């Protein structure tokens, strides 16, 4: 369930004009911008961006970048982007880090529908003039390269049909490779990159039924490396997305210095989907609400915007 609260009736032209007015004069009226964009759903934001372009012959995101700064600017621009553009940007930023953040790629590959993943790849090529697969291949080697390239490039079945016999046989394949009985990880990569989320969940359940332990616990017995870290993230993301995201949020807030990139990514990408469930589990596991944690660890306009996406603040 979504956390964002948006009005049923609104005027994209009026919103565009109010945003322009907020950006004029001696100082930017950040509160006005938050009260508009922090309370508009995806469809409404698209119309506002179109209206802004038609009226002022300027991209709204360019305007926001020129007027705002810091974590607030990064979060609100991420929010205004269409989802395929957003995923392309997140993937590119993750790959450009000194140590690439492979878990961002895993999240995108695991949590998007085949159509959404294809749209993100198209947006990536449009924005950066080369493919996501090419950039992944140039920044990775070995098993981590094979896993990530396969996951982002696959167009998987997205239905609910499950083959229980296949789940049992492929649970055995994963078990053999995880325990080191196989020569390489090709079969694990094949299973993760070609099976639907429903089929993978069935495989993971059969794994635990047959071998008495979860696949993620067995993976913890191996020395940590990039490939196994990404593999664990993929499995956790597929098995229980709510738990996965609640943990990402906890880690982003509990680190020495808040990890704003992770905080932005989860709140912005899940606010219109399942953030209510994520915040509920966050509270159960941490004995503090996500709202309270954000209010404590962030400040100013950035804090106000994140809280708006969580359903707080006044609408304009």
Swiss-Prot record:
The modification Phosphotyrosine is found at residues 128, 155, 282. PANTHER family: ANNEXIN, ANNEXIN D8. InterPro entries: Annexin, Annexin_repeat, Annexin_repeat_CS, Annexin_sf, AnnexinD_plant. This is Annexin D8. Pfam families: Annexin. Keywords: Acetylation, Annexin, Calcium, Calcium/phospholipid-binding, Metal-binding, Phosphoprotein, Repeat. Annexin repeats lie at residues 10-81, 82-153, 165-236, 240-311. Belongs to the annexin (TC 1.A.31.1) family. The modification N-acetylalanine is found at residue 2. The keyword Phosphoprotein applies. Ca(2+) 1 binds at residues 25, 27, 67. The keyword Repeat applies. Ca(2+) 3 binds at residue 298. One of its GO terms (biological process) is response to salt stress. Ca(2+) 2 binds at residues 253, 257. It comes from Arabidopsis thaliana (Mouse-ear cress). GO terms for molecular function: calcium ion binding; calcium-dependent phospholipid binding. Transmembrane segments: none annotated. PROSITE patterns: ANNEXIN_1 (PS00223), ANNEXIN_2 (PS51897). A pair of annexin repeats may form one binding site for calcium and phospholipid. Induction: Up-regulated by dehydration and salt stresses.
């Amino acid at each position: 369930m979504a956390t964002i609260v948006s009005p049923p009736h609104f005027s994209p032209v009026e919103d565009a004009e109010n945003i322009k007015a907020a950006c004029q004069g001696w100082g930017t009226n950040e509160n006005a911008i938050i009260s508009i964009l922090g309370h508009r759903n995806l469809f409404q934001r698209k119309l506002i961006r179109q209206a802004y372009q038609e009226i002022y012959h300027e991209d709204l995101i360019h305007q926001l970048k020129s007027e705002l700064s810091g974590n607030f600017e990064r979060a609100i621009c991420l929010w205004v982007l269409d989802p395929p553009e957003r995923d392309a940007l997140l993937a590119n930023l993750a790959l450009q880090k000194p140590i690439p953040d492979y878990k961002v790629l895993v999240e995108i590959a695991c949590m998007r529908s085949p159509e959404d993943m294809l749209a993100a790849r198209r947006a990536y090529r449009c924005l950066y003039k080369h493919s996501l697969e090419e950039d992944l291949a140039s920044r990775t080697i070995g098993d981590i390269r094979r896993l990530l390239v396969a996951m982002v490039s696959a167009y998987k079945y997205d239905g609910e049909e499950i083959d229980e016999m296949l789940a049992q046989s492929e649970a055995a394949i994963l078990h053999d490779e995880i325990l080191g009985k196989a020569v390489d990880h090709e079969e694990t990569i094949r299973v993760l990159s070609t099976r639907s989320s429903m089929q993978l969940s069935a495989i993971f359940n059969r794994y635990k039924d047959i071998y008495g332990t979860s696949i993620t616990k067995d993976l913890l017995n191996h020395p940590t490396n990039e490939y196994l870290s990404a593999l664990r993230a993929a499995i956790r993301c597929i098995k229980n997305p709510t738990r996965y995201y609640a943990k990402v949020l906890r880690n982003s807030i509990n680190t020495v210095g808040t990890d704003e990139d992770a905080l932005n990514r989860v709140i912005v990408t899940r606010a219109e989907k399942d953030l209510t469930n994520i915040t509920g589990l966050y509270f159960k596991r941490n004995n503090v609400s996500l709202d309270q944690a954000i209010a404590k660890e962030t400040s100013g306009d950035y804090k106000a915007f994140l809280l708006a996406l969580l359903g707080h603040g006044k609408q304009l």
